From Swiss-Prot:
Record site feature (Important for Na(+)-selective paracellular ion transport), residues: D55, D64
Reactions it catalyzes: Na(+)(in) = Na(+)(out); K(+)(in) = K(+)(out); Cs(+)(in) = Cs(+)(out); Rb(+)(in) = Rb(+)(out)
Function of the molecule: Forms paracellular channels: polymerizes in tight junction strands with cation- and water-selective channels through the strands, conveying epithelial permeability in a process known as paracellular tight junction permeability. In intestinal epithelium, allows for sodium and water fluxes from the peritoneal side to the lumen of the intestine to regulate nutrient absorption and intestinal morphogenesis.
Keyword Transmembrane: yes
Modified residues (Phosphoserine): S111, S211, S214, S217
Gene name for this UniProt entry: Cldn15
Gene3D superfamilies registered for this protein in UniProt: 1.20.140.150
Main subcellular location of this protein, as a coarse class: other
Post-translational note: Palmitoylated.
Topology with respect to the bilayer: Multi-pass membrane protein
Extracellular side: 25-74, 141-159
GO biological process, one term: regulation of intestinal lipid absorption
Protein name as catalogued: Claudin-15
């Protein structure tokens, strides 16, 4: 059962990592809203790297942010957290492939596989946590500007990339918990994987049984001889 759980957790974490990789370059982290605007000629959507605008004819123009130092602090922080999440996810994925008991990579014994799986699960949990913090931090700034009556700039709504990132982070955390929990549950010796010593029958009992059989046969022989 634990092998199935750790395998399920591994694939769940791999799916979460894939979704995090799709979330990072996605253009729709935030989308401009028509709330409070009488006439809207274009739609603006942004992510952590560039901003795009679509006019009424559907033509899009994108431009990169001019300088990293000119960006807001939360954008730089979200960049660092998302990149860290993906790196941790890749490390966890590699260690998980080596540590799974259904794989045979490098002829590693079960105790070392359990340690590798524990580290892989911890990496996936940290990756999901970094992604969750980055997405939530970005979303908080969007909602703060949106509900601020004194903010005179363009107001934005949550983009589809944020929902994808939340789902990816949750999958990474749950998958890491599944992988890590199997290592904790298997810390005690498993009877199914216990290596037992070969059975050796007692030589003393065998010798006594042999001597008893010989005495019985001798007794029968003696009676037949006198008859």
């Amino acid at each position: 059962m634990s092998i199935a759980v750790e395998t399920f957790g591994f694939f769940m974490s791999a799916l979460g990592l894939l979704m995090l990789g799709v979330t990072l370059p996605n253009s729709y982290w935030r989308v401009s809203t028509v709330h409070g605007n009488v006439i809207t000629t274009n739609t603006i959507f942004e992510n952590l790297w560039y901003s795009c605008a679509t006019d009424s004819l559907g033509v899009s123009n994108c431009w990169d942010f001019p300088s990293m130092l000119a960006l807001s602090g939360y954008v730089q922080g979200c960049r660092a957290l998302m990149i860290t999440a993906i790196l941790l996810g890749f490390l966890g994925l590699f260690l998980g492939m080596v540590g799974l008991r259904c794989t045979n990579v490098g002829n590693i014994d079960l105790s070392r596989k359990a340690k590798l799986l524990a580290i892989a699960g911890a990496f996936h949990i940290l990756a999901g946590a970094c992604g969750m913090v980055a997405i939530s931090w970005y979303a908080v700034n969007i909602t703060t500007d949106f509900f601020n009556p004194l903010y005179v700039g363009t107001k934005y709504e949550l983009g589809s990339a944020l929902y994808l990132g939340w789902s990816a982070s949750l999958l990474s955390i749950l998958g890491g918990i599944c992988v890590f929990s199997t290592c904790c549950c298997d810390s005690k010796e498993d009877p199914a994987t216990r290596v037992g010593l070969p059975y050796k029958p007692s030589t003393v009992v065998t010798a006594r049984a042999t001597s008893d059989e010989s005495d019985v046969s001798f007794g029968k022989y003696g009676k037949n001889a006198y008859v």
